[in-house]
Amino acid sequence: MFENFSPSTMLAIKKYAYWLWLLLALSMPFNYWMAQDSAHPAFWAFSLVIAVFGIGPLLDMLFGRDPANPDEETQTPQLLGQGYYVLLTLATVPVLIGTLVWAAGVFVAFQEWGWLGRLGWILSMGTVMGAVGIVVAHELIHKDSALEQAAGGILLAAVCYAGFKVEHVRGHHVHVSTPEDASSARFGQSVYQFLPHAYKYNFLNAWRLEAVRLRKKGLPVFGWQNELIWWYLLSLALLVGFGWAFGWLGMVFFLGQAFVAVTLLEIINYVEHYGLHRRKGEDGRYERTNHTHSWNSNFVFTNLVLFHLQRHSDHHAFAKRPYQVLRHYDDSPQMPSGYAGMVVLALIPPLWRAVMDPKVRAYYAGEEFQLTAEQSERPAAS
């Protein structure tokens, strides 16, 4: 539908369509409202998850792809100079935190949907915090301003994953698409093999990287300058606050949505780099990261909801490049669907491998000898 639109037209559409993230946040009160008079209230607790992963891929197919890039000489400088795009990301913080607190109250008070409905409510809130909260946090922690860094930290603290703020920038972006990166899935590895190591290593590696930073400055590792301590204390304060306000069920809700959000993040990590690798030179060093080391997806609907996260190839080639000016490359490896569809595909390993393994082999024609799961030797989590 959008393939033949000019870059100028697409930029005009996207400027306001980035507000589509509000659909996810506002779906929570809408679904609660629908559940109150429903004979099947538990359905409405799950309905956001059904919409995201069931209807989302269909909307991607309906609206098609967006291959348009801004003109580097004229449009990109204009886009970079507009504070509107920064305010758009910052606006997610009060909306998401407010929704999270409100949803905890509903989780405790609305007993009509029982434990099944409560499970659906946790999955729905976790999907919102993963698909919007962590995605926006990812954008913000790459920025230099203290305000954006703090906003990103708050969103990550709300899902108990402050380590991402450190490990993603100083670990993942350094070692992406190599065996040294726990967030880069190896060829032949299922998402269920990938997740346990990603949880453990990324948490521990964040502390290791922060310790390295502090030691280089001659500072104590467990001093007040360790930002992970402060962010995890904020997560603890939020947990205690939810317990004080809503009781033990409030704490269950807070931890449950955090686990769902983090799991969604790591599944997306799996999708973004599956089977791709940076070639190692004779000197033992890996080639420089470029736009061929991440899977790209130009399906316009999910790209708008996710702030262009699916133009991941350009993001890894130019990590500081803001979302509104990320570019499409024809020679980047291309996903057959947007992230919503790819997450569903990843959860069914035989189907995932049937779709994705031929794409990886075709992309690395002549280098198939490197595409072995045995290559995925993982670093010790020290």
Curated annotation (Swiss-Prot):
Give the UniProt keywords, A-Z: Cell inner membrane, Cell membrane, Iron, Membrane, Metal-binding, Monooxygenase, Oxidoreductase, Transmembrane, Transmembrane helix
Q: Where does the record place it? A: Cell inner membrane
The pathway this protein participates in, as annotated, is: Hydrocarbon metabolism; alkane degradation
Source taxon at top rank: Bacteria
**One Pfam family it belongs to:** FA_desaturase
* Keyword Nuclease annotated: no
GO molecular function terms attached to this record: alkane 1-monooxygenase activity; metal ion binding
Q: How does it sit in the membrane?
A: Multi-pass membrane protein
Q: Name one GO biological process term.
A: lipid metabolic process
Q: Which reaction does it catalyse?
A: octane + 2 reduced [rubredoxin] + O2 + 2 H(+) = 2 oxidized [rubredoxin] + octan-1-ol + H2O
The induction text for this entry reads: Induced by n-alkanes when cells grow slowly during the exponential phase. Expression decreases significantly when cells reached the stationary phase of growth. Repressed by citrate.
According to its UniProt record, this protein's enzyme class is oxidoreductase
Name the Enzyme Commission number(s) assigned to this protein. 1.14.15.3
Which co-factor is required? Answer: Fe(3+)
**Binding residues for Fe cation 2, per the UniProt record?**
H173, H312, H315, H316
Q: What family is this protein classified in? A: Belongs to the fatty acid desaturase type 1 family. AlkB subfamily.
Q: State its role.
A: Catalyzes the hydroxylation of n-alkanes in the presence of a NADH-rubredoxin reductase and rubredoxin. It preferably hydroxylases C16-C24 hydrocarbons.
- What name does this protein carry? Alkane 1-monooxygenase 1
Organism of origin? Pseudomonas aeruginosa (strain ATCC 15692 / DSM 22644 / CIP 104116 / JCM 14847 / LMG 12228 / 1C / PRS 101 / PAO1)
Gene it is expressed from: alkB1
